[in-house]
Amino acid sequence: MPEKNRVRYGCSSEEIARDFAEQLKYNQDADVYHTTKEGRYEAIAYAIRDRIIHQWDLSRKTQRKNHSKRVYYLSLEFLMGRAMTNNIINLGIEKPVKEALSSLGYTYEELRDTEPDAGLGNGGLGRLAACFMDSLATLELPAYGYGIRYNYGIFRQQIKNGYQVEQPDNWLKDGNPWELKRPDLTYPVFFGGKVTYLRENNRDTYKWVPDEQVNGVAYDTPIVGYGGKTVNTLRLWSANSPDGFSFQEFNSGDYTEAVRKKINAETLSQVLYPNDTLYMGKELRLKQQYFFVSCSLQDIVRRFKRYENYSWKNFPNEAAIQLNDTHPSLAVPELMRILVDNEGLGWDDAWDITVKTMGYTNHTLMPEALEKWPLPMMEKILPRHMQIIYEINRRFLSSAVSYFPMQNDKIAKISIIEESNPKMVRMANLAIIGSHSTNGVAALHSKLLVENMFPEFNLIFPDRFNNKTNGITQRRWLLDANPDLASLITEAIGDKWITSFDEVEKLKAFAEDPSFVEKIGNVKTKAKLKAADFLKKDCGIILDTDTLIDVQVKRIHEYKRQLLNALNIVMVYNRMKNDKAYRESFQPTTYLFGGKAAPGYVNAKLIIKFISSLSAVINSDPQVNKLLHVYFMPDYRVTLAENIIPATNLSEQISTAGTEASGTGNMKFMANGALTIGTLDGANVEMAERVGLDNIFIFGHTEEEIANLSKNYSSIEWINGNPEIKEAIDLIKSGFFNNNEEGIFNPLLSSLIEQNDRYFLMADLALYNKRHDEASTLYKENRAEWNKKSLLNIASSAFFSSDRTIKEYADDIWHIKPCHVKKSKEDTVLEDARKSN
């Protein structure tokens, strides 16, 4: 029998089982025989959370006592996925949790699979933020993540008749046992109104008189570092109305007006990325961004002012604020507003503090993806901030003129205000000017930022631009997602790799050991069987595990070139139909696609439809369907990725060179032993450097070659110059894949022909097809060599840990140090309660 007072923090299987049973009984009035699956999941989640809470509190107290500088990571997205397995692995209690549940007649897997994904992100941006939070806690670096607690995350994707259908992702419908509501941390956020001017005490004073208020309430989620010592906080803001429900209006019969303010306020945290094709959607997105920035900065300032005798000049020594893309860049004028209007600092002092505090991460090389807001909208919603932006811009441009005398075009380019109709506010320019650091996320990306996108800013601020190549957390993407491979690695080199990923380089020593290389292949086979089981349950796909598994999973976008992959499959299909010898020698292959298209992105949604149509034709063609399979996996999310990535043989990373900032999916596949077929784009360049060109299938035109090609590019010449490409295009034109929907794929054909193929698919397709043939032949004819290359990819992925990335941010940008937190061995709940009174 466990000691009664150890039930909430003891880590034996008995103590966990008792806590689980007590959660059922006292929180749900249930027992182990009469409860639902959801109730059991909630009970075990609360039991695990109990083992986090004390260390979470101790982490905060230790960081406060040590006066540790903290990093505040502001991101509109946090694609966390499921929390339970990650938490028990990082706490080191996986075995006792499973034993506890087994002793009561339940399986851990059943309850694990009940947890919904926390889909508070759209793709790489949000998943990067999640990996960074894991690394920050594991490295014992004091940190808060700040974002929005969306009631509905990224939509749930269904495929109906080949089309993407968006369904609401009501991930909070059963509550979230990992979070704690913090009503004591509620902040007012204001919009609209006017600004009044006053001259007093020999200084200009501005007062914002807003006409709208919402409140932001904090919800905290613990982020457990590996080893369970440091527990940092992800703080998400939920919007509500300060006015609530109006009984007066309700009783007078105006039922709609009685709840209007409440509904309008709560809209701010309802949906991730509302459709902004309409004015109302744009306004809502702008309000969302300011809402989370305002709440976060009020919270940061509150924490800073808690110290006695605080001095604002020390603020950058206490706080580093990192802007994950431009979505939080309103933090620049908001901090200025707080310092100048609320705290009474002079402009120069406030600006010095702001720039020293802020860092900005750029995530795009697409000029049209750089965020801009209509100036009239900004003036209407945030009138005081617009005044501050004007003043920032005026001072900056007056100093920049000396760099570009008589060059009005360059001055116009670096201005925060774009002189269009209507005028626009350029958020990337604001972030660069207002931050002491601007970083790219891969070596090529950072090079192109300073050479192509922002050369003028680099001339003015040469010390501000730097590179921080992205990374992934090996704890989720290898230890958690691929336990068989993790065990094999630990068996070979020990377990230090879990927190020091450089250790996996030691695996290179096993590349000439045939028995170990064979084990790598066996692990991949087991992962395929697991993936097949998952896909059958998740979406009904029957995966042939004896085939080469070729996977492209990522956001659907024309620059990521899912269409290139699909066109290559059409070429392979035609060749199989026309050439018996080719068909008989073909390596059986399954092509898996997954990813979501933005609801308003017509061509991306058509690409999904085309892949689905391709799948329907090929999978039902008896001449080829025992050799060639094509599937679109619906509702791509973290959990699906965790099951598919370990099973992949060939990873598709095929964006047009010079368009992908970095990518992190490429790193996840590499660490799990997939070979990559890819262009020299984003982090693929650094992957190729580390693994060697013999162990990666690089193809296509380089970024420089694309730039030269674009000067007189003609896609139709490339089509007509290759009979197989022309045959594939003609087959699509003929309506062969249309399924009685006449002209359905004309917009895609138009993008390739009439619109001259912006992303150079036709220029790269033959090269891509050739490399595919080489990969297929190697897999078929020399599996041992393939497995050796797989091992070398795992060993060469050492550089791509988010631990390495975060250490670079901490040393070069944030200047923060680890704060070591002792592991609590005893329950001090009563002592803590007495001290608090």
In which residue ranges do the predicted regions lie?
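A conserved ligand/cofactor-binding region detector
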Residues: 1-837
